[in-house]
């Protein structure tokens, strides 16, 4: 029996919908194709354990899973839940009439509970753009994804809830977040206030001009003269983030996995201060599994580079390119 359902792959700060096709036939082997990485291939063991613990038997037949488009590398363990649901649907354990209306994502523990994922916000945006009726994901990420309007977001605790939902024996309560209320609620006070600075009127004037016009600023002075202290207080005099800027900034931090678990939106200007020994990848981003670097994480905020004379030469070249 052939079953089709949908997951998502995060590329940069955007998400691409991934079609997951599962076919069951006579045999005893398990095939997973579509350019999966090691974490995706290891999902077989997590799925087997999660199903057994929750009273379901892994099918004793040949299972072929295809993840399309095949030219996009599928990375991470967030495909565990859609793969498990697809396998059960292909063998008749789950009804398939509602599967194609939902986007499913989540990492499984061995007991069937769900672990949080990275990039829930860009995935939710992609789900809304593609016209999905709902988005099923771990409950830890539900508020983050629910800031996207016109999309039903269902936060689930374990795989049993998802199975019962598709079989019609349980209803899932959507997570509802008023985006504007959440935005204003998260506009907290800055930990460092520019009003605390006493004296240094010329430097304060330069900082105010830089903040008002969005200019770069180079501060030179003797050790202990207050350069770092004043730089840390610069975000408190920057213009407030707009809602569009907040969503843009939150997407970047969501992909990097740096969102506070109690907050679904970043509503204040970010302040990033990387160490002077920061590597090129940490500064610009990238790596084997591409992640945003300090430059991206400081988007719409302040990137503070202290002790410039001790930084590696590649930092300056990267900043010129950026």
Predicted features by range, described:
Residues 275, 279, 291-322:
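Conserved AAA+/SF3 P-loop NTPase catalytic/coupling segment centered on the Walker-B
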């Amino acid at each position: 029996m052939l079953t089709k359902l949908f997951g998502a792959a995060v590329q940069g700060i955007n998400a691409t919908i991934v079609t997951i096709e599962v076919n069951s036939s006579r045999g005893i082997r398990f095939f997973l194709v579509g350019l999966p990485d090691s974490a995706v291939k290891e999902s077989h063991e997590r799925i087997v354990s999660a199903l057994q613990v929750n009273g379901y038997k892994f099918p004793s037949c040949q299972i072929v899973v295809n993840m399309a488009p095949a030219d996009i590398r599928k990375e991470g363990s967030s495909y565990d839940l859609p793969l498990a649901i697809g396998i059960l649907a292909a063998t008749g354990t789950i009804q398939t009439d509602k599967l194609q209306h939902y986007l499913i994502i989540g990492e499984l523990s061995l007991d069937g509970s769900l672990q949080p994922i990275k990039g829930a916000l860009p995935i939710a945006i992609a789900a809304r753009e593609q016209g999905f009726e709902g988005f099923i994901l771990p409950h830890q990420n539900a508020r983050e994804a629910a800031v996207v309007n016109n999309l039903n977001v269902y936060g689930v605790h374990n795989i049993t809830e998802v199975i019962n939902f598709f079989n019609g024996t349980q209803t899932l309560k959507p997570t509802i977040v008023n985006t504007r209320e959440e935005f204003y609620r998260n506009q907290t006070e800055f930990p460092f206030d520019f009003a605390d600075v006493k004296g240094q009127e010329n430097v304060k004037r330069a900082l105010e001009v830089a903040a008002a016009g969005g200019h770069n600023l180079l501060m030179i002075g003797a050790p202990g003269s207050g350069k770092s202290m004043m730089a840390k207080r610069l975000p408190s005099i920057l213009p407030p983030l707009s809602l569009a800027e907040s969503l843009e900034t939150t997407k970047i931090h969501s992909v990097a996995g740096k969102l506070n678990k109690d907050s679904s939106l970043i509503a204040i200007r970010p302040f990033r201060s990387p160490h002077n020994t920061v590597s090129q990848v940490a500064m610009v981003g990238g790596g084997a599994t591409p992640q945003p670097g300090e430059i991206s994480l400081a988007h719409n905020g302040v990137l503070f580079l202290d002790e410039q004379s001790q930084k590696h030469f590649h930092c300056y070249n990267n900043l010129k390119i950026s």
